[in-house]
Swiss-Prot record:
Keywords per UniProt: Cytoplasm, Lipopolysaccharide biosynthesis, Nucleotidyltransferase, Transferase
Protein's organism: Haemophilus influenzae (strain PittEE)
Gene (name only): kdsB
InterPro entries: Cytidylyl_trans, KdsB, Nucleotide-diphossugar_trans
Reaction(s) the record says it catalyses: 3-deoxy-alpha-D-manno-oct-2-ulosonate + CTP = CMP-3-deoxy-beta-D-manno-octulosonate + diphosphate
Name of the protein in question: 3-deoxy-manno-octulosonate cytidylyltransferase
Task of the protein: Activates KDO (a required 8-carbon sugar) for incorporation into bacterial lipopolysaccharide in Gram-negative bacteria.
Biological or metabolic pathway of the protein: Nucleotide-sugar biosynthesis; CMP-3-deoxy-D-manno-octulosonate biosynthesis; CMP-3-deoxy-D-manno-octulosonate from 3-deoxy-D-manno-octulosonate and CTP: step 1/1; Bacterial outer membrane biogenesis; lipopolysaccharide biosynthesis
Amino acid sequence: MSFTVIIPARFASSRLPGKPLADIAGKPMIQHVFEKALQSGASRVIIATDNENVADVAKNFGAEVCMTSVNHNSGTERLAEVVEKLAIPDNEIIVNIQGDEPLIPPVIVRQVADNLAKFNVNMASLAVKIHDAEELFNPNAVKVLTDKDGYVLYFSRSVIPYDRDQFMNLQNVQKVQLADAYLRHIGIYAYRAGFIKQYVQWAPTQLENLEKLEQLRVLYNGERIHVELAKEVPAVGVDTAEDLEKVRLILAKD
């Protein structure tokens, strides 16, 4: 099965400016992500960036680069520009890997592409089980709820489903008994290229603006998303300087 990976790489991160070029074990972070994507078996890997320095570095280590606008409001808008510019066929499977995931397991990159191919949907993703109560109540950990067949019912930063009997008068998070129903969404997506172009034609919705979760636009417009449990739990991504140091320590041991 053929699929294409697109890696958005913004230089102007608010919390860690220039992070695509941050050195990790002698390589820029974006190169680590690129190499993981290649290891997944993708037929094509494209780095999408709005920065000439990132583009030059990526070309030097052999990556295909697509320059994109600095004015996109979301990562999906950046993907749509790449799909249009490179005339990628509508039925091609596109996997979106964030440029700040240098430890992403190649096996789950392939898995999300296979997930999309197996089901009659235009979008697929992955999740992992939540085993920690603090993670469950952390709004930065996005929860996902599915039906019995893995089709998404909703994504939220809130606790879903809400255990009324246990949470109504909760005094100590550490005493929470977690059910198997609690899943954390992993921010890796597979789409058909034509669907990405459709997505950006839809207006932003109140749901996505409230939760700050752009995937809710898909559900609002009546499309289905299929989610599987990830075969491997991905390690930390890089959002802050502290995250960067953690990743450096992990890769220094390899």
